[in-house]
Curated annotation (Swiss-Prot):
Keywords: DNA-binding, Metal-binding, Nucleus, Repeat, Transcription, Transcription regulation, Zinc, Zinc-finger. This is Early growth response protein 4. The gene is Egr4. It comes from the Eukaryota. Residues 286-296 have a biased composition (Gly residues). It comes from Mus musculus.
Length: 478
């Protein structure tokens, strides 16, 4: 910096003694005649013109001022002193990036700190001048009285009409730094570099900044907190839209389409045509059992042509072909056949009573209709249960899968085989409640019970004719 003394007052210059002379002469020496006009002209004229003319004439003035011994001196007794220097204190003496940013600020280039530097530095890593006297004010600055301590670098608020600034907004001062300890710039010559250099920025400021080529004026930057955090709300909405999609991704949407597995229908002809699946329906289980009341009922797997709507599905079967059991040389037992359908056959619901009638406690949603019709064209019978249809079909086909192990007699129904075996063993599990007579079949017991009912009715008629009912007596009381 160039510091010049104020030479406007001539009285102040004449009052200072001469510096650097060995002996001061009490009275002014007489100058040569060639310098007389200059000496006579100085008291009311220019001192610099007189000094230069005196030194250029013979050098006596200069020699007399700097050599020891008595010598003539100028009448003013003044010396001109000045200094020209540049006081530059580097912000980071050992940081190449700081030097690069300093030179960029001087040359008018906008610094662009990389992501590594922005991530490694903390918000408190602000550009403070290095050195022991960095925090002291500049004693040689002429504008010390007007502005003692300018604002710190991060608090230099941009104003409209100022030079253009690129990429980032000025960051607010950290809360940990006290306002009284803010460091001034190193020197007034580095104000341009200080305005260009910026400290590390917050992540949302880095995200909200544009590309390096888009530079705008400082007047376009926003300094309000609402404007600073507007980009944060946008980023949060983007993250929520990614983490919580409104619909399934592409592969999942292709695998699970809406309405693909709601309902399925089974065509009547899916189980095969003809009598290929009929032996499997007519084949009884391995053990003995009956469909009547004696030994339980044989409930075969119902045909899979039963649809939810209760439509006929067995009407397409053709029973004109002979079965395996009816062929000559057959053992009477149908050969097992693989199921034609991949879906398991659903079992029909067992009724409390026969004939398709439910009890009073039954809450069946479907109407009580006989959905299982005989597929034979000449037969018009229909049944409410599939096992009843299976027993009926054996009448048309003549299939007798149940054989007695004692006499090798074949039967079309399991209950018939059960009662036949009791004839060989002599078992009579059913006993009359009135007389105690025992029977081998339940239907025989029912027929016998009707005999007792008729006898009771005749006895009551006799007592009524005798007048016992008028006295309040009955046949049971007698």
């Amino acid at each position: 910096m160039l510091h010049l003394s104020d030479f406007s007052g001539s009285d102040a210059l004449l009052s200072k003694p001469t510096e650097g002379c060995a002996h001061a002469s009490p009275e002014l020496p007489r100058l040569p005649a060639r310098d007389a006009p200059s000496a006579a002209a100085y008291p009311g004229g220019d001192f610099l013109s007189w000094a230069l003319s005196s030194c250029g004439a013979g050098g006596d003035l200069t020699d007399s001022c700097f050599l020891e011994g008595p010598a003539p001196t100028p009448p003013s007794g003044l010396s001109y002193s000045g200094s020209f220097f540049i006081q530059a204190v580097p912000e980071h003496p050992h940081d190449p990036e700081a030097l690069f940013n300093l030179m960029s600020g001087i040359l008018g280039l906008a610094p662009f700190p990389g992501p590594e530097a922005a991530a490694s530095r903390s918000p408190l890593d602000v550009p403070f001048p290095a050195g022991p006297d960095a925090l002291l004010p500049d004693l040689y600055s002429p504008d010390l009285s007007s502005a003692a301590f300018p604002e710190a670098f991060w608090e230099a608020a941009p104003s409209a009409g100022a030079p253009s600034q690129c990429l980032f907004e000025p960051q607010l001062s950290p809360p940990d730094v006290k306002p009284g300890l803010r460091a001034p710039p190193a020197s007034p010559a580095l104000d341009a570099a200080a305005s260009a250099f910026k400290g590390p920025y917050a992540p949302w400021e880095l995200l909200s900044a544009g590309v390096p080529g888009n530079c705008g004026s400082q007047g376009s930057f926003q300094t309000t907190p609402e404007a600073r955090f507007s980009a944060v709300g946008t980023k949060v909405e983007d993250l929520l839209s990614i983490s919580c999609p409104a619909e399934l991704p592409g592969p999942a949407a292709r695998l699970y389409q809406a309405g693909a597995y709601d309902t399925f229908s089974l065509a009547p002809g899916d189980l095969g045509e003809g009598t290929e699946g009929l032996p499997a329906l007519l084949t009884p289980p391995g053990g003995e059992g009956g469909s009547g009341g004696e030994g339980g009922e044989f409930l075969a797997a119902p045909p899979a042509q039963l649809s939810p709507l209760g439509l006929r599905g067995a009407a397409t079967a053709d029973f004109s072909k002979p079965l395996v059991a009816d062929l000559p040389g057959g053992s009477g037992v149908a050969a097992p056949s693989s199921p034609a359908a991949s879906f398991p056959a659903a079992k029909a619901r067992r009724k409390g009573r026969r004939g398709g009638k439910c009890s009073a406690r039954c809450f069946c949603p479907r109407p009580h209709v006989k959905a299982f019709a005989c597929p034979v064209e000449s037969c018009v019978r229909s049944f409410a249960r599939s096992d009843e249809l299976n027993r009926h079909l054996r009448i048309h086909t003549g299939h007798k899968p149940f054989q007695c192990r004692i006499c090798l007699r074949n039967f079309s129904r399991s209950d018939h085989l059960t009662t036949h075996v009791r004839t060989h063993t002599g078992e009579k599990p059913f006993a009359c409640d009135v007389c105690g007579r025992r029977f081998a079949r339940s239907d025989e017991k029912k027929r016998h019970s009707k005999v007792h009912l008729k006898q009771k009715a005749r006895a009551e008629e006799r007592l009524k004719g005798l007048g016992f009912y008028s006295l309040g007596l009955s046949f049971a009381a007698l």
